[in-house]
């Protein structure tokens, strides 16, 4: 391949062609992250609790992480969200409306030892889950 004085057009064309083999570029150019994202690019979303589930932690840890299976209101997609805090799962009941946001793993993926869980419950029926766990607020009855 030419590196000479008049090779610029050729170099640019080749660079553009081989750029597609870079996974980061191709995902960004085709907007794959946005298409796959259940929240559709939004930072938080509202959802209805379908059931409580216990997710086993990955090795070398041994625990059952308390999560909830929820259905998003905006598009009907089902995702699993982690309930953070000691006894937090007790404040969440089926058919409650919860607010979920990303768990903060790299590239929008899961975090730590909880496999396949990419979201966190931040609120229940309009009240912060953290406030409920601390005891500073009471859950609103619907």
From Swiss-Prot:
Cellular component aspect of the GO annotation: small ribosomal subunit
GO BP: translation
Superkingdom classification of source: Archaea
SUPFAM superfamilies noted in UniProt: Nucleic acid-binding proteins
Any Pfam family matching the protein: Ribosom_S12_S23
UniProt cross-references to CDD domains, sorted A to Z: Ribosomal_S23 (cd03367)
InterPro entries named in the record: NA-bd_OB-fold, Ribosomal_uS12, Ribosomal_uS12_arc, Ribosomal_uS12_euk/arc
UniProt keyword terms in alphabetical order: Ribonucleoprotein, Ribosomal protein, RNA-binding, rRNA-binding
GO molecular function per UniProt: rRNA binding; structural constituent of ribosome
rRNA-binding in keyword set: yes
PANTHER family tied to this protein: 30S RIBOSOMAL PROTEIN S12 FAMILY MEMBER
Protein family: Belongs to the universal ribosomal protein uS12 family.
Subunit structure: Part of the 30S ribosomal subunit.
Function statement: With S4 and S5 plays an important role in translational accuracy. Located at the interface of the 30S and 50S subunits.
NCBIfam families hit by this protein: PRK04211.1, uS12_E_A
Name assigned to this protein: Small ribosomal subunit protein uS12
Gene name of the record: rps12
